[in-house]
Amino acid sequence: MAKYEILYIIRPNIEEEAKNALVARFDSILTDNGATIVESKDWEKRRLAYEINDFREGLYHIVNLEATDAVALNEFDRLSKINGDILRHMIVKLDA
């Protein structure tokens, strides 16, 4: 299984319950498509290098996971581009 890290930035003015629901939804998207989540945690609220969608800060969330193929990653990528609560995301394959 290959190891991956996903970092995504959530808009800063989201309510705590909505943020938790968003994180749970995207975690379930990954697990439903065959990935195994090793760790999913909030990093911190950070200032952005440049303004994104009129926001100067964002809530960073990190997910470490293992996957045998790219199905879960492709679905996460597709749905996170559509979702207005996620400002940016990045998927990185970690060295074995």
Curated annotation (Swiss-Prot):
Keyword presence, Thylakoid: no
Recorded GO CC terms: cytoplasm; ribonucleoprotein complex; ribosome
InterPro entries linked to this entry: Ribosomal_bS6 (IPR000529), Ribosomal_bS6_sf (IPR035980), Ribosomal_S6_plastid/chlpt (IPR020814), Transl_elong_EF1B/ribsomal_bS6 (IPR014717)
Keywords of the record: Ribonucleoprotein, Ribosomal protein, RNA-binding, rRNA-binding
GO biological-process terms attached to the record: translation
NCBIfam families (alphabetical): S6
Function comment: Binds together with bS18 to 16S ribosomal RNA.
Family label: Belongs to the bacterial ribosomal protein bS6 family.
UniProt-recorded name of the protein: Small ribosomal subunit protein bS6
